[in-house]
Amino acid sequence: HGIHGIRKDKKGRIYLIGGNDAKFSGHEDLKQYRGIEGGGIIRYTSELKEPILICHGFRNPYDFDFNSEGQIYTYDSDCEREFVLPWYSPTRLYRVEDRAHHGWRLPGYKRGWKRPDYYFDSVKPLVNVGRGSPTGVMVYKHTAFPEYYHDAVFYCDWTFGKVFMTPTSTNSIGAEFPSSEVFLESMGTNGFAPTDIEL
């Protein structure tokens, strides 16, 4: 639940994602931000200076990626101990919104407290996936696959051994998104626990 993925954008700026025990709240680099809850994303210059809090309110996202427009996508974890309880919050795919709270409020891993998706001041997930352990995230920026997959988000579940895919639009602000599709999974007794995905 600490610091996880690191990526660069097209301008060479460095982004860092961390879970709800990454201790972003109260960190010397982020002392100008008050009320940080859960995990978040920080952006630095290419020289690792001038940190900016992009967003917060995550439980434990491992990875993230940018689409062709520079929008960030991440896959956040659930609190598996609360599965089937009324307040359970499933794993979920987000299109990250700048300076926004994405719902998760507590540190630690033993219990959860996520704002409901209908709260006006929380970002609603693009897709609520269900039980799982989110790991790698990649936006497909290539031409080998059919156009249907261009700019689609691929994201991995370690627990159930699946790679999900959610197609997006090149004009993704306000676009409609379908449910997750299983792109890849193991069969029979073959083990498959994806931890990362790259292109």
Task: Cite the ranges covered by each PLM segment.
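Beta-propeller domains with acidic blade repeats across secreted/periplasmic ectodomains
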Residues: H1-L199
